Amino acid sequence: MKPQQLATQKFSEHCGYSAAQTVFAPGRVNIIGEHTDYNDGFVMPCAINYGMAVSFSKRDDSVWRVYAIDIDEQDEFDLSRPIEPSEHKWANYVRGVVKYIQEKCPEFKQGADLAMTSDVPMSSGLSSSAALEISIGKTARVLGDLPLSLTEIALIGQQAENKFVGANCGNMDQLTSALGQKDQVIMIDCRSLDITPTPVPHGYSIAIINSNVKHDLVTGEYNSRRQECEFAARFFGVKALRDVTSERFIERAAELQAQNELAYKRAKHIISENQRVLEAVEALKANDMVKLGQLMAGSHDSMRDDFEITIPEIDYLVELAQVAIGKNGGARMTGGGFGGCIVCLVPDEKVEHLRRIIADNYEKQTGIKETFHLCTACDGVHLI
């Protein structure tokens, strides 16, 4: 059963009446451009046909009663009172979005019953958290008829995750869930928020293979990577690493390396990755899938060697996929790192070969069974 249908059904069972409306917000997969978003750089994701559905109806008070179907938990809070953190981690994504919507729209106090469910795997690097944030933001906009653009909702989602949940994410995930376009990858300039859509190549599929090694980015490694990037930006005297050219980096690389080896390696990844994204857009426009495959491979190598966010299981999956796909197409880790998924752009005629190669080897090598998803690029958040 699709999340949209399940949300509607479970709302009726849990609340005792039928939901008025349902919102769907997609997850996302990032084709190339990893950890560049919080460095004001470039990314090239697409929204995918897995996401979060929220069925909801207005109440005649200011209470939000939120039922999380997948874990059978409920959270309740009152919009007429200051919104405080919940003991449930998932509920803080909801509360955080509503809290920061109220900062922009102080009059918003419309209560609601909500039931939500997702088919985005948790901690997989496919933005289950952003899908939750954007679905809640859209729900609030509908409930209160609020004058918020989808871009504003995306930035509120990022703010909630940064300040209320405590994860220093960039803005790519939320922008993609809000603004995705059917059959398009979208290059996002994470500083200007300009979007450049480019069609997914005809005859190619997007395959996402989940290593089923889970990560949790709220603590530790993700935030330390961000701090190392900020150190490098201060070293170069710029607002963000987006502003450092390859030439300038090379000129001062030895000096940075002597001061801070990790900051040097992180900056090397970010600066080269931004260039790869720009080249990937041109490769897609030219339908040059050999070039795109090379760029994806370069991105993965850089994440492994310089940003140091891959793990052996992910590296092995990428090796298998690259062999199965060949030169026309590519594979790399996608998401924050330390587990999660790889993304593949694979010729349609090689999809089953890829599936078989992975199935025959990955579990045998790692003791973990992968999950294989074929995805389509889809529209961003919408009412159903």
From Swiss-Prot:
Record-linked Gene3D superfamilies: 3.30.230.10, GHMP kinase, C-terminal domain
Site (Transition state stabilizer): R28
A GO molecular-function annotation: ATP binding
Binding site for substrate: E34, H35, T36, D37, Y222
Source organism: Actinobacillus pleuropneumoniae (Haemophilus pleuropneumoniae)
PANTHER family listed in its UniProt record: GALACTOKINASE-RELATED (PTHR10457:SF7), MEVALONATE KINASE/GALACTOKINASE (PTHR10457)
The protein, known as: Galactokinase
Active site: D173 (proton acceptor)
InterPro entries linked: Galactokinase (IPR000705), Galactokinase_bac (IPR022963), Galactokinase_CS (IPR019741), GalKase_N (IPR019539), GHMP_kinase_C_dom (IPR013750), GHMP_kinase_C_sf (IPR036554), GHMP_kinase_N_dom (IPR006204), GHMP_knse_ATP-bd_CS (IPR006203)
Enzyme class: transferase
